Structure formats: structure tokens, C-alpha cells
Design a protein with these regions (language model features):
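Short beta-strand/loop segment at the start of cytosolic alpha/beta domains
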Residues: 1-16
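Short acidic-hydrophobic, aromatic-tinged amphipathic segments that line or gate anion-handling sites
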Residues: 100-103
């Protein structure tokens, strides 16, 4: 899975999964996020704009990140995906109620 991580600024990082976020690729994203947390990152922007598909494994990684980050006093923001199917899935599962979304 291709994951783009932009420069950290004041313990904030933007992570942009570029491929499907599913049971096969979710462990790679989880590992990347774990490494960033170990490096002291507190605030995450997860850019889903280029994510064409997401299943429950991908959503579980995001929920886990949100829990861990809130416990550490950090935050998680999600960039709305362009793929209508992913956007609809996030709305149906009410992710838009627990995460802050930006365009």
C-alpha cells in the first residue's frame, strides 16, 4: 500500500493513503501510524481524498487512532474522500459524527 506522509509540523502530520484501505492494506497503515505516535505525533490529518475503497478493517484503524490520540490529548481530522462509495460508507456508519471532517 502506498502511504504518503507529509512533514511533521508542531507534532502534526498529514497521512494520505493512496490505495484501497481494506483488510489487506490496513495493517500497513496501522504500523505507519504506530511509528508516528512513537515519534511523538499528537495531531493527525488523514487525507482520504485519494482512497478509492474502504472496508471495516480500514475504519477500525481510524477508530483505534482516534481513541489513542484523544487519550494523549491529540486530535484526528479526516479529509473527505472523493470516491462517493467511501463517502457514503463513512456517512452511513456515522463517522461524520465522531470525526471532524475537512474538505
Amino acid at each position: 500500500m502506498k502511504i504518503v506522509v507529509n512533514e511533521q509540523i508542531q507534532r502534526t502530520v498529514t497521512v494520505a493513503p493512496q490505495d484501497r484501505l481494506d483488510a489487506f492494506s490496513a495493517p500497513a497503515l496501522r504500523q505507519q501510524l504506530d511509528e508516528l505516535a512513537a515519534d511523538g505525533v499528537l495531531h493527525y490529518i488523514i487525507d482520504l481524498s485519494a482512497t478509492p475503497f474502504m472496508d471495516s478493517a480500514g475504519m477500525a484503524v481510524l477508530v483505534s487512532l482516534l481513541r489513542r490520540t484523544r487519550q494523549s490529548g491529540g486530535s484526528v481530522k479526516l479529509v473527505w474522500p472523493r470516491a462517493e462509495a467511501v463517502r457514503r460508507t463513512l456517512q452511513l456508519t456515522q463517522f461524520d459524527r465522531i470525526f471532524e471532517f475537512v474538505e
